[in-house]
Design a protein with these regions (language model features):
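Histidine-centered copper-binding motifs that mark active-site loops
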Residues: 1-517
Length: 517
């Protein structure tokens, strides 16, 4: 960091850019958005010329220029970077620049539900009811899959300037004690300099008063660091697209250290002799889950509405974008094996006050016999838009520090890990078990074969560890959380997750036993 520009604080310049990076050596590199530290005269680093990559990897990346000059980074943009290391009570100042492309070129490469607040029409696109003064719904509702309710105007290409753009970005320090002007809340985003959107910045965006105004497409932040040692993280928080920006890569660790921690790791301290890694701060593990676009044949079978041109082909990030109800009135059982959500009009008792009722299904076949055919389309379908947001997603590929299914070699000694759960909505039950000696790779834990077989056809079954082949390994010793050090260490042995199955209990279905969860 820069310790000379402002007395008593540490300064750094950070930008958001687009880049390509592989999560596995055998897979294509998906397009990502992420943070990179900018090179300055005080902190030049490796002085890497920055550019914005494209969804089509055959198209050359566009050099990033600011006021006509090439922009340089301290390092090459990489996933979950840069980590900011701060000291308790020594503030950090951040100059943030949104260096994403302008206009359509800067659109997200993920499905955006523009009916979400902050992702679609802005105030300039709205008309007030002359009597109630409430914004009117301008979409034409013809009750078909092609009308404006199902295909919002802000989801079209190009979208009107009165719609919120998809290249908005911000920095929010999650868990920090921060003045409101530097919170990075959903209404403090900025667009890149020169963008044609009607809304170049959020309505509550403010710069730090004693720092120079960085101009359009940039803003300044002041973090107090008035907290004990802990692992936090900073991430995007732009209104309406936070979940997508973070999924695309806009997140990174933020470490605060203090004198107490220094005493613990010093010679003779409680953590003396524990492996702290090359940084001396512990081994950071950021655990996520993602899904990647498969080959064209699988996409055609499983997700025929996926837009290759807009969201990317094989190897790029995939996320749910179709509202799939768990009910199917056209099926003999009334259920849909593909569904995820309960649709109100098909629930019991059915909801009747929704603004947009179910609409005619263009794929309905009245001759389909649900008692004979494996699947029949219902006469009606939900009136949800194309694209529809998913309330949550449980992705199929675990990612640790930007690598899918990673492995590492350790010595028989104690290590300090700093673990951040950055999954979309998934909890991780972390345990140590001895590797299955029958696999040959020594990287897999043995699971009970009968449960593995049952799980192939029953998603309710969750295979547990076969401890005859993979006995329990060492315990975890938990010493802290994102609220600082614990008053006393907690020993956490290996344990499969079990669930409360007594339907008479109020917490029926909750996790019962677990390890480090």
């Amino acid at each position: 960091p820069d310790t000379t520009t402002h007395t008593g604080t540490e300064d750094c310049e950070i930008a958001v850019v687009r880049y390509l990076q592989k999560f596995a050596s055998s897979r294509p590199a998906p397009l990502l958005r992420g943070y990179v530290q900018l090179a300055t005269t005080v902190v030049p680093g490796k002085h890497v010329a920055l550019d914005n990559a494209n969804l089509n990897p055959t198209v050359a990346a566009a050099p990033i220029r600011l006021n006509g000059a090439q922009v340089y980074g301290v390092d090459t943009p990489h996933y979950l970077g840069p980590t900011i290391v701060a000291t308790k009570d020594r503030p950090t100042r951040v100059l943030f620049r949104n260096l994403l492309p302008t206009g359509m070129a800067g659109d997200l490469f993920l499905p955006v539900d523009t009916t979400m607040m902050g992702a679609g029409e802005g105030p300039n696109a709205m008309m007030l009811d002359p009597i109630t003064k409430v914004p009117m719904d301008m979409a034409t509702n013809d009750g078909t899959v092609l009308d404006q309710v199902r295909n919002p105007v802000c989801g079209q290409d190009p979208k009107p300037a009165s719609c919120y753009s998809e290249n908005r970005a911000i920095v929010h320090l999650h868990g920090g004690i921060t003045p409101w002007i530097s919170d990075g809340n959903p209404h403090q985003w900025t667009t890149p300099a020169g963008d044609s959107s009607d809304y170049p910045k959020g309505v509550s965006m403010q710069n730090v008063p004693d720092m120079p105004d960085p101009g359009p497409g940039a803003q300044t932040f002041f973090y107090t660091n008035q907290q004990s040692a802990r692992l936090l993280f900073y991430h995007d928080h732009a209104w309406g697209i936070t979940r997508l920006n973070v999924y695309a890569g806009e997140a990174a660790p933020y470490l605060i250290t203090d004198d107490t921690e220094k005493k613990l790791v010093a010679p003779g301290g409680a953590l003396d002799g524990v492996d702290m890694g090359n940084s001396g701060l512990g081994h950071s593990l950021t655990i996520e889950d993602k899904t990647f676009v498969p080959d064209a044949a699988k996409v055609a079978h499983n997700d025929p509405t996926w837009n290759y041109a807009k969201w990317g082909g094989q190897g790029n990030l995939w996320t749910p974008h179709v509202y799939m109800p768990a009910q199917n009135p056209g099926a003999a059982t009334g259920n849909s094996p593909f569904g995820r959500w309960m649709y109100g009009p098909w629930f019991w008792p059915p909801s009747t006050d929704q603004k947009y009722k179910p609409i005619a299904n263009p794929y309905y076949d009245p001759t389909c016999d649900a008692n004979v055919q494996p699947f029949c389309e219902p006469a009606q379908i939900p009136s949800t838009p194309n694209v529809s947001v998913g309330m949550e997603a449980f992705h199929d590929t675990p990612i640790v520090n930007g690598t899918a299914y990673p492995k590492t070699t350790v010595d028989p000694k104690a290590y300090r890990f700093r673990i951040l759960n950055a999954a979309d909505d998934r909890f991780w039950n972390l345990s140590w078990f001895v590797a299955d000696p029958t696999t040959g790779t020594m990287t897999e834990v043995a699971l009970k074969k009968s449960e593995v077989t049952a799980a192939q056809s029953d998603p309710v079954v969750q295979p547990t560890v076969d401890q005859t082949l993979s006995p329990k390994g060492p315990d975890w010793v938990q010493i802290g959380t994102d609220s600082g050090f614990l008053p006393t260490p907690a020993v956490v042995p290996a344990q499969d997750v079990t669930y409360i199955t007594d339907p008479t209990r109020f917490d029926f279905g909750n996790a019962d036993k677990h390890a480090l969860l």
